[in-house]
Amino acid sequence: MPFTKNQIITLEIEALSNDGNGVAHKDGQAVFVPLTAPGDVAEVRIVKPMKTYAFGRVEKLLTAGPGRVRQDCPVAGPCGGCGLRHISYEAECAAKTQFVRDAFARLGKLDVPVPDVLGAPDTDRYRNKVQLPVGTDENGHIVTGFFAGRSHRIVACTDCKLQPAWMNELAARTCALLEENGITAYNEETHTGRVRHLYMRQGWHSGQRLLCFVVNGNGLPNEAEICATLQKEFALTTILVNRNSERTNVILGRRTRTVLGPGVIEDTLAGVPLRMGVHEFYQVNTPAAEVLYAKAREYAGLKPDDFLLDLYCGMGTIGLSMLADCKRLVGVEVVPQAVEGAKETAARLGLDADRADFRCQDAGAAAAQLAAEGARPDVIIVDPPRKGCDEATLTAIAEMAPRTVVMVSCNAATAARDAKWLTEHGYKAVEVQPVDLFPRTKHVECVVKLTRG
């Protein structure tokens, strides 16, 4: 019999689901409860009953599970960004390992080794990029923060534990300067107000800092003075203004101009020199990304005469980080700015197109074209978005028949699905390594090694 809304029941949390919610069972139904830990015993209010399962929230914690720790962020619950801050990092790593194992066993139906997750070098202050929505609080003051789950209500946050302290301090100072200059925050309901988002990025190894104002309009009143003040106080390498006057939840508009500095920052990732503005995709946790890239390189097992194909290559960092191991690299990416960045990096490294060729194409279309041309890469790396690879891409990969396919994924479910498809078309799943790029959140990456035959 289904539960009823507002019904109070006592539950013991058994495990965490792959979205970070605690899972318990009662009367044959699963109940999902946010911000709980395995072993917790709690009085739970049913907030959303369904036919065969329900969602609840803790009314009273009766007994804490062994992995529960003191919550050290006052807005972690409503903010929704740090869904796992209430459990120890050891417990978090165990849960993330299980997320990936469950995906490949249950969804992929694959009997493949999944070692324990490779934990992140740092669990706090690790983000090299943040995009903060700008709004007003109940007193009319300008604030930044994060959207509450499943809403566009801003939860004000002055000290996000995941981003460097200077980003929090810069956000607070910017809000004060906006108020002092009579500049308003954007209101998406009325499509009025000026500043929509603050975008900040840091070169992790270089220390260079970028700030971009995303504005509804052409710029800011007193823009030069505000930017000069912030550049001086926070040692900013560059400041930009991005114009977004559309009624949209897409953060960045199409037009960006530089106010101060070079318009980009420089950094290195796995030894590859990079230049980044605001449009380029870049892993937000540099040290952990280097752990992931090292595992991908190990799985690739490249040889000196090999041809490496890097699909969904972004700025080319994975492929370029492996180029010393092989003879030729072709990278494919659909975002023009990323492809230009990859080409620029290759040129800075003294590589011509015969050695490192980057193409602006859809991954599936490019893979199909290469297969039709008779291309036979020895190793293919794919790093698709959360939706995974489409069947056209997988079909072309199977047709090109590389000896090794390395999949990098931010979604274990779609990675398991795609790996299963490849195992049905001539490949064997050798190993799946979870890697934690996003400590204190529900997200986990994985690297999959598949070999021909």
Region roles according to the model:
Residues 59-71, 77-185, 205, 220:
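Extended interfacial segments that mediate partner engagement and assembly in macromolecular machines
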